[in-house]
Amino acid sequence: MMLEPLLSSLQRITAAWLSQPDPGHVCPRAADPRALERLLEPGDVLLVDGDTRFARIVKTMTRSTWSHVAIYVGPINAEPDAPTVVEADVKDGVRALSLEQFRACHVRVMRAVGLSAVERRAVADGVIARLGQGYDLRHAIRLGRAQLPMRQRPTEFAVDPQRAICSTQIGRAHV
C-alpha cells in the first residue's frame, strides 16, 4: 500500500513533536532516584507526572495528575546506572531506562498486594521480554477519541498486539 510509508513518516514526526518538553509544566515534587531505588521491588508500578506535550494531552483527557506508567524491573545488567525501569514511550516504543530519567518528575509507587517475590520477578521478566516493541499510537488516539461525544467519533482503529501503550504494558504484565 502506497500510503503506509507516508503514514509511518507522519507517525514518527508526530511522536517526535509530542515527545518535546511542555514549556508550561511545573513539577510539584521531583523524585529522588536513590530513595526510589531503595524502596522499589521488581513489578512495582510507577505513576508519573510527565513533562512532555503528550503528557499534557493525557492529563487533560484523563483529568489526572498522572500521565504515564512504568514498571520497575530491577537492574537489567551490572553497570552503574543500569536500566531498571521499562516503559512504553510514544517515540521509542517499549524501552528500558534508569530511574535517573525520572529525576525531574513527580512519581508515585504502587505495589500489588499479595504477590510473592517469584511472582513479582515474573511480572518484571514479562515486561523485559517486550523490550523493542513499538508504541501503539493508533490505540492512544482511539482512547483519546473515547473522550469525544458519540456523534463526533470517527471509525475505530484496530489495536495492534505487537505494539504497546504504557497502560497496556502494565495490564499485560499482571495477567
Model-identified regions with their sequence ranges:
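Cysteine-nucleophile amide-bond enzymes
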Residues: 1-174
